[in-house]
UniProtKB/Swiss-Prot annotation:
InterPro entries for this protein: ARM-like, ARM-type_fold, CRM1_repeat, Exp1_repeat_2, Exportin-1/Importin-b-like, Importin-beta_N, XPO1/5, XPO1_C_dom
Family in the record: Belongs to the exportin family.
Record GO biological process: protein export from nucleus; ribosomal large subunit export from nucleus; ribosomal small subunit export from nucleus
Name under which the protein is recorded: Exportin-1
Pfam family, one: CRM1_repeat_3
GO cellular component: cytoplasm; nucleus; perinuclear region of cytoplasm
Organism: Dictyostelium discoideum (Social amoeba)
Subcellular locations according to the entry: Nucleus; Cytoplasm, Perinuclear region
Length: 1057
């Protein structure tokens, strides 16, 4: 095998074919496959491998070998093309062109070698991206000319033009610089007349079906960017479809063989939103022709779902394209279709879309759902600005009234499952607890919920009527299935907040009353479990109603308590989760005395606590305790709060005292698996209570604090004396107790508002118990939660804790570094927690770094560099944040800045340039640009008052010129750009450093694409900032619509009373 790696000898093609055959033969043994992979990998990576490509393509007998050759060529073109001598570029280009012509000119050869020709086309387009237009300005005329010589060759040329269009207009943003993209687009548009004439000639004269289809498919890719006059002609001020578009409408759309490809072209045209009434007649002509044809193709729209079910792939594809055409057309031209002359077609088209929405095919449903969302939000915007006149309903809304009612039915019938529902029907029809989340279903639910909210705003009475009518049908037993009940209840829960309070009250009381009645009447545990989950989901979605209706709220909570005794899988979990949700939103209602009540509900709850939680599992009890904690914390009476906390924690404290009492007599009693697990559950209960009790948890922790630390010490000592015990069940249980203790302390410190009390009364014993143990234990038994706790202490206590930070660093700094710097994989949680700790010190106690020994400070900088060079995204971005904040802090003090930047700026600059230009850290692009810009500002703005260079060894007029030279030297290692290009780029960045951050990023992004010729899938992160801004604007817009923000994400505290 190794003989193919000798590039001084002619390549043995037979041997290469044999090696490739081993790789693709399913009967080959594993060792042979591994050897073949290794040799082929080395062959592909060899810098001269590309020189063997022509030999392989001409003489290899198997297609997989030829594909490997083309992969080698593809890599050369993308990454090394600019470094090749000009004559080699021309030679490669001419060879690929001649091979494509040879293989695609003969119909039989083209068909036989179709896969190879397709791959050659892709390689050729990569060459075009490099060569056109600078070194091959005549490409378009040449490919048009060759197309007229041979129909088979013409067909393949159409494929090449289609691929080129896609590369430039669809996929270019993250592959090429903005300048290059604009140049290619302008050239393509200028020379499109030649392509247009060719397409018109083919479509008017060709008889070869495959050529016509290829032309239509290519034309489709052109239509969303070609100059407008190729689509619309204006004669004497009157606009009409161009000759090419008329061909599509009148010759090819009626023809079944070409109908689908033609409709895809018309879809591209229909999507155009030109904002000019002069062109409206053209779009009316297109929709008229379409609707006239569709009346004959689909005379009964109600049969469309059955046509799809029974149809072949062509039929299904056509219905799919119809949905795209209609939804795209109406998104761009809805208003012109609302003219009285066009209303019949508008109505018919929406009837077709409603029926397509009923097809059981998710992608089709998503297309229609997106349109229904557009239509309903568009009409909602109209209503929001509609001034009431004699008409009670806006005219536009009246126009769509019938279709919107049908859409409501479709969405209610198809409602996706929300996240909160965990009682589901499996594929065998059994009711079970869901074990994994379906993220696609959750995304679909959010889209459907948003659309239903718009639809409810448009006509809440109709929405209610449909839902209640469906509920009555199910209650009567007609058409009852779990699925129908579920989708209806999920839809009911989804419209919370979209009705006024009075409507919501009538609606919800009716729904819950009917569901409770259904629960009573239905026999069987499965039925009751499904109905219980639906009731719990609905009540959890309407906190506003519950807050306003105490008796109903009390009934709901008591019903949840009943469900907590239900053994059916998932019911207890949902009951606890729903109770937690309601407690968060309605907490004050439970601690104040309500009308006609003798005491606040919290008293009743705590008196019956042991009974209520008797059948719950430990994890469910933890959830329950968090829920009750929110209620207690909401009381404004401090004495009452303290009394409640004491009562609330009686059960866990009783168990705790029993265990501690036994330990006081015999400490060994703690050293059993059973006791360790009991302690673990008690600490978890405390942790969840601490989360919700917040500051008033201090009443509880004061009782258990010293015992808690003593247990921690006891388990630490036992593990230290028996280091291998951590592999055993007892050791694992002890470590779990320690970890949960650390989490509880972190929660307590973060949630407490009285930081001085924590510092004075709690901090010293904590540090003594935790830090010494961390420092002296073996690496395998050091808990990453210690680092997280120290981060919380520094972040929460800020200046108070400054005296203790050196002690913290002494215990964890070098100890942790020795664990995490040996490789990039071991101790992943220690890694991220350690760098979060360093960031916390940098942000809250930066002056502590001043007191570090220079060697220690260098170690700190080294570990920050090590962090941002890490391939794990979280760690890398944390390292970048630390460096950014470190530079900000250092720059505030001139003396500190001089020393720091003199010592570290150049090395840090090289490190930042390294990750900016490699392929593994693109997710940090925005932060890397920020840091680079800050470094340039440091030298440009005179933050450093002393020379960064050694005047004895080099003489620069300023620090700026010195840093520019450093950057130019680093970037000059790339063969893809010349030194003058690099110098121009660096000068531009320095000019932008103090002017515009976005321009600085854009310039850097363009240069990196030039530098590396990066592939699109690697470069999405270079645009992450822009995408995040778009998301934020969309969320802000959503928050203005009642009901659009999920009810449990709304802060209702201001209205809690």
């Amino acid at each position: 095998m190794e003989n193919i790696l000798n590039f001084n000898e002619p390549l043995d093609i037979n041997l290469l074919d044999q090696i490739v055959s081993v790789l693709y033969n399913p009967l080959s043994n594993k060792n042979d496959i591994k050897a073949a992979q290794m040799v082929l990998g080395k062959f592909q990576e060899h810098p001269d491998a590309w020189s063997k490509v022509d030999t392989i393509l001409e003489t290899s007998k198997i297609v997989q070998t030829k594909f490997i050759a083309l992969v080698i060529m593809d890599s050369l073109i993308k990454y090394r093309w600019k470094s090749l001598p000009r004559e080699q570029c021309e030679g490669i280009k001419n060879y690929i062109v001649s091979l494509i012509i040879r293989l695609s000119s003969d119909p039989q050869t083209s068909s036989r070698e179709k896969l190879l020709v397709n791959k050659l086309n892709l390689v050729f387009v990569q060459i075009l991206k490099q060569e056109w237009t600078t070194n091959w300005s005549t490409f378009i005329p040449e490919i048009i000319s060759s197309s007229k010589t041979n129909e088979s060759l013409c067909e393949n040329n159409m494929v090449i033009l289609r691929l080129l269009s896609e590369e430039i207009f669809n996929f270019s943003e993250e592959q090429m610089t903005q300048t290059k993209i604009q140049t290619l687009k302008i050239t393509f548009e200028k020379e499109f007349s030649l392509i247009n004439d060719l397409c018109f000639y083919i479509l008017e004269n060709a008889t070869r079906a495959s050529l016509i289809k290829a032309t239509l498919e290519t034309l489709q890719r052109f239509l969303n960017w070609v100059p407008l006059h190729y689509i619309i002609e204006v004669n004497g001020g009157i606009a009409e479809p161009s000759k090419l578009v008329k061909l599509l409408l009148h010759k090819y759309f009626p023809e079944p063989l070409f109908r689908n490809s033609t409709l895809k072209c018309l879809t591209e045209i229909g999507n155009l939103n030109l904002g000019n009434q002069q062109y409206d007649a053209v779009f009316i002509a297109i929709i008229d022709k379409f609707m006239n044809q569709i009346k004959f193709i689909k005379p009964d729209p109600s049969k469309i779902p059955q046509d799809y079910e029974d149809g072949d792939q062509g039929e299904r594809s056509f219905i799919h394209t119809v949905s795209l055409f209609l939804t795209g057309f109406f998104k761009s031209h809805l208003k012109i279709m609302e003219n009285s002359l066009n209303i019949p077609y508008l109505t018919l088209a929406h009837e077709i879309l409603v029926n397509i929405s009923n097809i059981d095919e998710l992608e089709l449903f998503k297309i229609c759902l997106e349109y229904w969302n557009f239509l309903s939000s568009n009409l909602y915007s109209d209503i929001a600005t509609f001034t009431t006149t004699l008409l009670s309903t806006p005219p536009r809304l009246q126009l769509y009234k019938s279709v919107l009612s049908k859409v409501r039915v479709v969405l209610i019938d198809h409602m996706a499952k929300p996240e909160e529902v965990i009682v589901v029907e499996d594929e065998n029809g059994n009711i079970v607890r869901e074990t994994t989340k379906d993220t696609d279903s959750l995304t679909l639910y959010e889209s459907m919920r948003e659309t239903l909210i718009f639809l409810t705003h448009l006509d809440s009475e109709n929405t209610q009527h449909i839902m209640l009518e469906k509920l009555q049908t199910l209650i009567s037993g007609r058409e009852f299935t779990f699925q129908r009940l579920n989708t209806l209840c999920w839809a009911i829960g989804s419209i919370s907040g979209a009705q006024n309070k009075e409507q919501e009250k009538r609606f919800l009381v009716t729904v819950i009353k009917d569901l409770l009645e259904l629960c009573q009447n239905k026999k069987g545990k499965d039925n009751k479990a499904v109905i219980a989950s639906d009731i719990m989901y609905i009540v959890g979605q309407y906190p506003r109603f519950l807050k306003d209706h105490w008796k109903f709220l009390k009934t709901v909570v008591n019903k949840l308590f009943e469900f907590m005794h239900e053994s059916h899988p998932g019911v207890q979990d949902m009951a606890c989760d729903t109770f937690l949700k309601i407690s968060k939103q309605c907490k004050r209602k439970f601690v104040v005395l309500q009308v006609e009540e003798s005491q606040p509900f919290i008293n009743e709850l705590l008196n019956q606590l042991s009974t209520t939680i008797a059948h719950l599992e430990q994890s469910q009890i933890h959830t329950f305790y968090e829920a009750v904690g929110y209620m207690i914390a909401s009381s404004s009476d401090a004495a009452f709060r303290e009394k409640l906390v004491n009562k609330f924690m009686e059960l866990p404290n009783h168990s705790w005292l029993q265990i501690m009492g036994a330990a006081s007599v015999k400490v060994e009693s703690l050293l059993t698996v059973e006791v360790a697990r009991d302690i673990l559950n008690l600490i978890k209960t405390n942790n969840r209570a601490a989360m919700s009790l917040e500051n008033c948890y201090i009443t509880q922790i004061s009782k258990i604090y010293l015992d808690l630390l003593n247990v921690y010490r006891t388990y630490s000592d036992h593990i230290s004396r028996n280091p291998n015990i951590y592999r055993e069940t007892l050791g694992q249980a002890m470590r779990s107790v320690k970890k949960e203790t650390l989490k509880l302390l972190e929660t307590f410190i973060e949630k407490s508002s009285d930081k001085q009390v924590i510092y004075s009364n709690f901090l010293q014993p904590l540090l003594e118990a935790v830090l010494g143990d961390y420092r002296t234990n073996i690496p395998e038994t050091r808990d990453p939660e210690v680092l997280s706790l120290m981060t919380a202490i520094i972040t929460s206590l800020k200046q108070l804790v400054h005296p203790e930070v050196p002690k913290i660093l002494e215990a964890v700094f070098e100890t942790t570094l020795s664990m995490i710097t040996k490789n990039f994989e071991d101790y992943p949680y220690h890694r991220i927690n350690f760098f979060n700790l360093i960031r916390a010190i940098n942000s809250n106690a930066f002056t502590v770094f001043h007191n570090l020994h220079p060697q220690q400070f260098k170690l700190l900088i080294d570990c920050v560099v090590w962090a941002f060079k890490h391939t794990e995204r979280n760690i890398s971005e944390t390292g970048l944040h630390i460096l950014k904040e470190l530079i900000e802090n250092v720059s505030k003090n001139s003396d500190v800045a001089n020393v720091f930047f003199k010592t570290y700026l150049v090395s840090l600059l090289n490190d930042i340039l390294y990750i900016l230009t490699d392929s593994f850290h693109k997710s940090g692009f925005a932060l890397e640009c920020d840091i680079l810009r800050m470094m340039f500002q440091v030298v440009e703005n005179g933050v450093v008052k002393i020379p960064l260079f050694d005047p004895q060894q080099a003489n620069f007029p300023s620090n700026s010129e010195y840093v520019k030279e450093i950057v130019v030297t680093f970037l000059s290692a790339s063969p893809n750009v010349s030194r003058p290009q690099i110098q121009a780029f660096v000068t531009r960045l320095f000019n932008l450093a103090n002017i515009n951050n976005n321009d600085f990023k854009s310039a850097t992004r363009d240069f990196l694409i030039t530098l590396k010729e990066w592939k699109s899938h690697e470069n999405a992160d270079l645009y992450s900032d822009e995408k995040n801004i778009e998301k934020a604007l969309a969320l802000k817009k959503q928050s203005m619509i009642p009901g659009m923000v999920r009810p449990n994400d709304v802060n209702l505290e201001m209205n809690d009373l």
